[in-house]
Design a protein with these regions (language model features):
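Cleavable N-terminal export/targeting peptides
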Residues: 1-34
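Gram-negative and organellar
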Residues: 31-444
Length: 444
């Protein structure tokens, strides 16, 4: 791996993102921006840092961290830039120090009100080098997805609103060279209001994908055509997509498949809700990772998970057919909160040698306000991940319990424990891990 490749990828994206932010700062008044941030110093003891099955090594890790959340909801600029960076220092030298960062950013500049917007979007995250291996420090890498381009709004007759989007997309991975790509995407949309809370839209999308690295994967063109029906009621939201997708590869191959998506949310009461998502479509890792960042300001504020920041995506640029379903029940009471449900996801890669996989399991989060300044949080997840080509099957179980205490509006602390278990059918990939954790946080 060359130093040039490690530096050049992030440098291009950082320069483009900085240009977009500078443009927005110039266009928006200073008082329109709001900045929240936190500083944290954490100490953890990990009894199996490298997640070894036969030779566990324990260590104590000190982790200073900085998180920020910058927002603007003005008429000319709408933006949310949220991130966290942490530096992990291993006292017993079980592993070298780590600098890890995550960032979600979306910026929309209204160049001509009602006519022309310019969008800049970026996501930096930590993901595994190999999804089949345990989440040890030597199996982590930074990846980045950057997108930018104009959106043009127009009318088609008296009742149909039109929209044209052009995006340049750049993807980069620190170690997985097969993820690096440049893309150009064009979308045309027309939406008609059918009645109160009901909209029907027609969508045409085309994308050119050029993958860096000769022989790693074939470049290809992707085309999507689908109808979207959206219904919003007082206690129920429904969105249905139906259409078709085509993939045309430069090496002469082609694939096609129906595009089906359904998303429903039912607010059963003032405090409870039930949501479900099901889909069958062509996708790829870059698309699935950048989708959570949207123009409606739903970028999650930065938080620090127990242990190291890390994701669970297979990092490559290969397209796959995704079949997935997720059900979530949520409750938000005066003292207690709960969210959880099952999930299932199957990825069938278009390439014969792709890492086809099936994952299913369940996850939940529970919170309880013990007093005005004490809160208990519990997170749990179980998953079975099976790689179809090799037959490798990994069962993982994760449990975390944390007690948060607030001292002043700015100062707080948390202490807790996490347990991670991994049972693999492949020799050497099973492991258990216990982490004890304490942290002091300043929030502004």
């Amino acid at each position: 791996m060359s130093i040039a490749r490690n530096i050049a990828g992030p440098a291009r994206r950082q320069a483009a993102l900085a240009l977009g932010i500078a443009t927005a700062l110039a266009a928006a008044p200073a008082q329109a921006w709001r900045l929240d941030y936190f500083l944290e110093l954490a100490l953890e003891h990990n009894d199996n840092v490298l997640l070894s099955e036969t030779d566990p090594i324990s260590d104590t890790i000190a982790t200073p961290a900085l998180g920020f959340d910058l927002r603007n909801d003005g008429s000319t600029v709408q933006a949310r830039l949220a991130g966290v960076v942490e530096h992990r220092n291993y006292f017993e030298n079980a592993y070298g120090s780590e600098l890890l960062a995550e960032f979600d950013g979306m910026l929309n500049w209204v160049a001509i009100p009602g006519r022309l917007h310019f969008v800049v979007q970026d996501r930096l995250t930590v993901q595994p080098v190999s999804l089949a291996a345990p989440d040890a420090p030597d199996n982590r890498q930074q990846i980045n997805i950057f997108a930018a381009g104009p959106t043009l709004f127009f009318r088609i007759g008296p009742t149909v609103n039109g929209q044209a989007e052009l995006r340049y997309i750049d993807t980069w991975a620190q170690d997985s060279a097969g993820f690096d790509s440049q893309r150009l995407s064009l979308a045309l949309r027309g939406a008609k209001q059918l009645g109160p809370g009901s909209t029907l839209s027609a969508n045409l999308q085309a994308q050119r994908v050029d993958i860096e690295g000769a022989g790693l994967a074939s470049d290809y063109d992707r085309y999507d055509a689908f109808l979207r029906w959206r219904r919003n009621l007082r206690s129920f939201d429904l969105e249905l997509d139906a259409g078709y997708s085509w993939l045309d590869f430069d090496d002469g191959g082609s694939r096609s498949s129906p595009l089906l998506r359904a998303m429903a949310a039912w607010r059963t009461s003032e405090r409870t809700s039930l949501s479900a998502t099901a889909m069958r479509r062509f996708s790829d890792t870059a698309e699935s990772l950048i989708e959570p960042v949207s123009l409606d300001g739903t970028i999650p504020a930065p938080t620090l998970p127990p242990g190291a920041i890390s994701g669970d995506a297979a990092i490559n640029a290969l397209p796959f057919r995704e079949t997935s379903f997720e059900l979530t029940w949520a409750y938000a009471g005066v003292r207690a909160t709960f969210a959880g449900g099952p999930f299932h996801r199957r990825l069938d890669y278009v390439a014969d040698d792709g890492p086809d996989q099936t994952g299913r399991g369940a996850q939940l989060g529970f919170g309880w306000r013990l007093s005005s300044n004490h809160r208990l949080e519990v997170d749990a997840r179980v998953e079975r991940l099976r790689f179809l080509a090799t037959g490798i099957e990994n069962d993982t179980r994760y449990l975390a319990a944390f007690l948060h205490r607030s001292y002043t509006p700015h100062w707080s602390s948390r202490m807790g424990y996490t347990r991670y278990e991994r049972d693999s059918s492949e020799t050497g990939l099973s492991a258990n891990q216990n982490i004890w954790y304490v942290a002091v946080t300043y929030t502004r």
